[in-house]
């Protein structure tokens, strides 16, 4: 947008031009209002909030606008202190986030979207372990898919998605409608519990000849 204060290597354009920013905020609210009235999304995923304060974005006003049409709308945390769930990026948190709900955002290689020169793809095994790590702490995994300019998905990404499909289909009981597992001091690995909390699932990354479980 021409009134957005884009950052360059040396300066921030329109930093001291409040009228331009006010015009952008009006435009932003207009776009959100149109989306809300026309399409009524169940979820809004914001990004780039760090470039302005909550007051500058009018984050509270945005939340009120979105919920005026759909009181149950879900909003991610990237709106300067507002929203329902946290979105750490590119690395599993060392400990479970304080937020009740959270979702790790991760790329299959090193880039968001499609970058033809980026061939540094993570293996399906590595990404599945990341997924399980998230599940064990009560989180979700948002895995980036970057289609090419013609709309097709790169073969490397298709291979990852197919592996995820095979694995999740086989182990769906230990994935869907589960919650965070037991503390790591009780089991040195990834775990989840079923909704009732009376079934414990252990994720074993390698085939073992013997598993000893003590009471």
Describe the residue ranges of each PLM region.
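Mature catalytic domains of secreted/periplasmic carbohydrate-active enzymes
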Residues: 1-210, 214-215
């Amino acid at each position: 947008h021409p009134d957005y204060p884009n950052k360059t290597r040396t300066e921030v354009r329109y930093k001291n031009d409040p009228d331009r920013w006010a015009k952008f905020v009006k435009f932003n609210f207009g776009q959100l209002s149109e989306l809300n009235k026309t399409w009524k999304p169940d979820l809004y995923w914001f990004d780039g909030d760090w470039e302005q304060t909550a007051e500058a974005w009018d984050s509270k006003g945005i939340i009120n606008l979105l919920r005026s049409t759909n009181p149950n709308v879900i909003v991610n945390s990237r709106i300067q202190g507002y929203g329902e769930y946290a979105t750490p990026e590119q690395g599993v948190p060392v400990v479970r986030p304080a937020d009740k709900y959270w979702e790790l955002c991760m790329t299959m290689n090193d880039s968001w979207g499609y970058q033809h020169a980026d061939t540094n793809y993570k293996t399906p095994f590595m990404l599945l372990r990341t997924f399980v790590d998230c599940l064990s702490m009560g989180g979700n995994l948002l895995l980036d898919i970057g289609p090419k300019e013609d709309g097709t998905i790169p073969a490397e990404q298709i291979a990852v998605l197919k592996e995820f499909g095979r694995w999740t289909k086989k182990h769906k009981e230990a994935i869907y409608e589960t919650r965070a597992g037991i503390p790591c001091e009780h089991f040195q690995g990834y775990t989840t519990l079923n909704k009732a909390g009376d079934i414990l699932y252990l994720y074993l990354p390698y085939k073992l000849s013997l598993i000893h479980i003590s009471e």
